[in-house]
Curated annotation (Swiss-Prot):
<feature type="active site">
    <location>
        <position position="411"/>
    </location>
</feature>
<keyword id="KW-0963">Cytoplasm</keyword>
<feature type="binding site">
    <location>
        <position position="323"/>
    </location>
    <ligand>
        <name>NAD(+)</name>
    </ligand>
</feature>
<keyword id="KW-0369">Histidine metabolism</keyword>
<dbReference type="Pfam" id="PF17392">
    <property type="entry name" value="Urocanase_C"/>
</dbReference>
<feature type="binding site">
    <location>
        <position position="197"/>
    </location>
    <ligand>
        <name>NAD(+)</name>
    </ligand>
</feature>
<dbReference type="InterPro" id="IPR055351">
    <property type="entry name" value="Urocanase"/>
</dbReference>
<feature type="binding site">
    <location>
        <begin position="53"/>
        <end position="54"/>
    </location>
    <ligand>
        <name>NAD(+)</name>
    </ligand>
</feature>
<feature type="binding site">
    <location>
        <position position="131"/>
    </location>
    <ligand>
        <name>NAD(+)</name>
    </ligand>
</feature>
<dbReference type="GO" id="GO:0016153">
    <property type="term" value="F:urocanate hydratase activity"/>
</dbReference>
<dbReference type="InterPro" id="IPR038364">
    <property type="entry name" value="Urocanase_central_sf"/>
</dbReference>
<feature type="binding site">
    <location>
        <position position="202"/>
    </location>
    <ligand>
        <name>NAD(+)</name>
    </ligand>
</feature>
<feature type="binding site">
    <location>
        <begin position="274"/>
        <end position="275"/>
    </location>
    <ligand>
        <name>NAD(+)</name>
    </ligand>
</feature>
<comment type="pathway">
    <text>Amino-acid degradation; L-histidine degradation into L-glutamate; N-formimidoyl-L-glutamate from L-histidine: step 2/3.</text>
</comment>
<dbReference type="InterPro" id="IPR036190">
    <property type="entry name" value="Urocanase_sf"/>
</dbReference>
<dbReference type="InterPro" id="IPR023636">
    <property type="entry name" value="Urocanase_CS"/>
</dbReference>
<feature type="binding site">
    <location>
        <begin position="243"/>
        <end position="244"/>
    </location>
    <ligand>
        <name>NAD(+)</name>
    </ligand>
</feature>
Length: 557
């Protein structure tokens, strides 16, 4: 048994520069990215190992964290560390092209895959919720979801408002690690936004990092600001301290009409992530310890009220969509039979991108030098010269996005381009243009790496929403291809029982061997997304598979 102490009063910051603390960059990289996940600029509650998303942790407890760090510093380049739900459980001899770390987080046999059983295991120190990029050590702060949210808002603007969100406003809630991206994404897309958040500390953090522009004093003040800025055609984001389950019904009652409605509260985790209406945060946390069943019930009842208000907006013809936190499922379990009347964001706006393997490609500069990221930004523009939309994103990102922890960048690119960029970055390390290696990873929210019937795989054309072979195959292929670390998780985004997903990270250290691994992994990884969607019958994916020369025996053979 290990010490299940999850609190330590300490500040962690990844090493910078090009001096190694481990034996090679292949082990230095996961070490730095683990530490970066717990940087106070990055993590929501680093002293309790919580990175984002309710209780998404980087390690099971502090004893496990210490042992992971110790093991990574001694790991050889023909050894692989196995991490089981945030606990380092073994080091085995493999080979130099194998992953240096293999991670499995939060996985439960399906019959027991629910929050009640997971919470029992967590309390005993036998499990850890890894979310998606918390336990896989590739979280880069809210930037990691900004572009995906931006792409969603832009596509919604195309579909509903003739391509322009000028003078429009988005109503949403949640300013945590994921939801905190919403105000900036809306601003970049040209819209105002009203962002409800129940924790003042989260509002303060988003103001400090320039993800949100202003805070209103109360609802009347917020609506007055929205009216002023939309009339002026300005894109300003406004935070409001309050509870969405109280404020959304009040807006419906007043006849207020937003132009778009969504939500990114941590509704996936009623015990830890959604404050019941009428409760203080302190009451919520205290009662979670003493009467968890009552807390879950109260949170889900409030979610039902919240979703009913969203349905009311939808009935008025206002574009309304779930942004992947499973709030519709929670409301349905509380008796809101038509909770799924409004769609999720993936089938509504994102799936055509997934069909081409396009998703959240990200990289981080292990040097800690922002100039390394700016140089890679320029390289992306050079190699993809004709994509004005992507260039605009990179320009806006440089101007508006504050780095959190190690400098990083995200841009949505797909099959073909990911490998091209990865190989170019590796050459930049080789030539000394970059001052230290970079790591390339992605969110588990990607085209071929997740099965989540209420989010990424909602309403698949062939009805295969719940088939979870695909992320397993993705993880196996990335392991075979030589990713530096590979992860396989359960329950990220939408909570226990509702998703399985995999992640990969690969190091660009400037070597020939790295180039070979990069070419394989950054082709195969998005390739599985095209494969998955082609198999489901999407013509865009079938065409992409043929154009890119994928060997899909039942489709291209």
């Amino acid at each position: 048994m290990t010490d299940n102490n999850k609190y330590r009063d300490v500040e962690i910051r990844a090493p910078r520069g090009n001096k190694l603390t481990a034996k090679s960059w292949l082990t230095e990289a996961p070490l730095r990215m683990l530490m970066n996940n717990l940087d106070p600029q990055v993590a929501e509650n680093p002293k309790e190992l919580v990175v984002y998303g309710g209780i998404g942790r980087a390690a099971r407890n502090w004893e496990c964290y210490d042992k992971i760090v110790e093991t990574l510093t001694r790991l050889e380049d023909d050894e692989t560390l196995l991490v089981q739900s945030g606990k380092p459980v073994g080091v085995f001899k493999t080979h130099s092209n194998a992953p240096r770390v293999l991670i499995a987080n939060s996985n439960l046999v399906p019959h027991w895959a629910n929050w009640e059983h997971f919470n029992e295991l967590d309390a005993k120190g036998l499990a850890m919720y890894g979310q998606m990029t918390a336990g896989s050590w590739i979280y880069i702060g809210s930037q990691g979801i900004v572009q995906g949210t931006y792409e969603t808002f832009v596509e919604a603007g195309r579909q509903h408002y003739n391509g322009s969100l000028k003078g429009k406003w988005v109503l949403t809630a949640g300013l945590g690690g994921m939801g905190g991206a919403q105000p900036l994404a809306a601003t970049l897309a040209g819209a105002c936004s009203l962002n409800i958040e129940c924790q003042q500390s989260r509002i303060d953090f988003r103001l400090e990092t320039r993800y949100v522009d202003e805070q209103a004093t109360d609802l009347d003040d917020a609506l007055a600001r929205i009216a002023k800025y939309t009339a002026e055609g300005k894109a300003i984001s406004i935070a409001l301290h309050g509870n969405a389950a109280e404020i959304l019904p009040e807006l419906v009652k007043r006849g207020v009409r937003p132009d778009m409605v969504t939500d990114q509260t941590s509704a996936h985790d009623p015990l830890n992530g959604y404050l019941p209406a009428g409760w203080t945060w302190e009451q919520y946390r205290d009662r979670a310890q003493t009467d968890p069943a009552a807390v879950v019930k109260a949170a889900k009842q409030s979610m039902a009220v919240h979703v009913k208000a969203m349905l009311d907006f939808q009935k008025q013809g206002i574009p309304t969509f779930d942004y992947g936190n499973n709030i519709r499922q929670m409301a349905k379990e509380e008796g809101v039979a038509n909770a799924f009347d409004f769609p999720g964001f993936v089938p509504a706006y994102i799936r055509p991108l997934f069909c081409r393997g396009v998703g959240p490609f990200r990289w981080a500069a292990l040097s800690g030098d922002a100039e390394d990221i700016y140089k890679t930004d320029a390289k992306v523009k050079e190699l993809i010269p004709d994509d004005a939309h992507l260039h605009r994103w990179l320009d806006m990102a440089r101007e508006r996005i504050s780095f959190q922890g190690l400098p990083a960048r995200i841009c949505w690119v797909g099959l073909g381009l990911r490998a091209k960029l990865g190989l170019a970055f590796n050459e930049m390390v080789r030539s000394g243009e970059l001052s230290a290696p970079v790591v390339i990873g992605r969110d588990h929210l990607d085209s071929g790496s997740v099965s989540s019937p209420n989010r990424e795989t909602e309403a698949m054309r062939d009805g295969s929403d719940a088939v979870s072979d695909w992320p397993l195959l993705n993880a196996l292929l990335n392991t075979a291809g030589g990713a530096t670390w590979v992860s396989l998780h359960h329950g990220g985004g939408v909570g226990m029982g509702f998703s399985q997903h995999s992640g990969m990270v690969i190091v660009c250290d400037g070597t020939d061997e790295a180039a070979e691994r990069i070419a394989r992994v950054l082709t195969n990884d998005p390739g599985t997304g095209v494969m998955r969607h082609a198999d489901a019958g999407y013509q865009i994916a079938i065409d992409c598979a043929k154009e890119q020369g994928l060997d899909l025996p039942m489709i291209t053979g």
